[in-house]
Amino acid sequence: MKKKGLRSVIEAIQDLLKGKTTTMPKSHSGEGIFFTSKASDLFILDSFGHQLSIQTLLGDVKVKQISASKRGTRVIFEISVDSKLHLNDVFKKFTNLTDSSDFGFDKTEIRVKLYTTSGVHISRSQARRILTGLEKFKIILLDFDKVPVVGQAFADEIYRVFQNAHPDILIQEENMSEGVKFMVERAKNEARK
């Protein structure tokens, strides 16, 4: 965590979920945990008193505190013997397949709800936390599921400031409430001026 300038275990988990996260870029691509978690039915990481649980079939990702009974990290990987999931499909989902693409790992999905503890996304600093490291991707999908509203500064940081600094990155959204959609469209319109 210190090497990457992260302030908490939660920030480390958030970075893992983005993909392309490694402290040793010459030795590791930062894709291992990301793709392994997507290729399972259930993937659990227990470390430093926190648990990351990914239930791929349900599309559910949870982070919670647990009792830190032992040192180190525990990994649970479950997949049904008759799983219909193919590793090739997992890689394709996070690969830009357009003609101009190099077919690398250049697409990520961010579950916005996992980036706050209070349930509200208002501040510019919260948006910056989400955006940290995303300049490495060409396509960013922001999933706003269970996010009721975002603030003006939050939306402005993503859709005007970040987007203007990185015009070649495509930012997509899904599962927006009416409140979120209003602020996102407002920020996009301001960015066009």
Please name every model-derived segment.
Residues 114-192:
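Amphipathic alpha-helical interaction surfaces in cytosolic regulatory modules
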Residues 1-67:
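Flexible ATP-lid and adjacent glycine-rich G1/G2 motifs of the Bergerat
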Residues 49, 80-84:
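Two-component histidine kinase transmitter core
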Residues 66-69, 81:
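Catalytic phosphate/metal-binding cores of nucleic-acid and nucleotide-processing enzymes, i.e., regions
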